[in-house]
Amino acid sequence: DNVVRAGLTSKHKDSSAFLELANMSSTELPPMVEPLKRGSTSTYANFGAPWEVIGVHDHAEVPLEETSTIVIVESGSATLSAKGAQWALDRGNVGFWARESGVLHTTAGSQVWLIRPV
């Protein structure tokens, strides 16, 4: 077993061997992505990935574009609606919105995340 453990285990830990192997020199941190805030939404984009993350906070109505979108309900509840149909998502639920325009409705105190390609 060629493992050098530094902690978080009941197995033998070799702190001095870990410190010998570890590179403790400072490095540049990646740039912090500042959100673009508009009303009840915060959009995180332009961070080197081909998608954007939109945080929807509290009671809001957010248009859903004709693109694939992952919807994650962290707290509260949300309703997705399009063409007269509705889908309800509660805390802990994840949904997938596929290439159709619609609307996301969230309730007071909700925290919902949308992840979609840019």
Positions of the model-derived regions?
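Ligand-binding loop in jelly-roll beta-barrel domains
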Residues: 1-5, 86-90, 99-118
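Histidine (H) residue identity feature
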Residues: 12, 57-59, 105
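A generic structural signal for short, non-catalytic loop/turn and secondary-structure boundary residues
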Residues: 46-49, 73, 108
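C-terminal, non-catalytic macromolecule-binding modules
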Residues: 1-43
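Conserved hydrophobic/aromatic beta-strand scaffold that supports enzyme active sites
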Residues: 33-35, 53-55, 70, 86, ...
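A short glycine-rich, His/Asp/Glu-containing loop-to-beta-strand
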Residues: 33-61, 67
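Glycine- and acidic-residue-biased ligand/ion/polar-headgroup-sensing regions
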Residues: 58-85, 90-94, 100
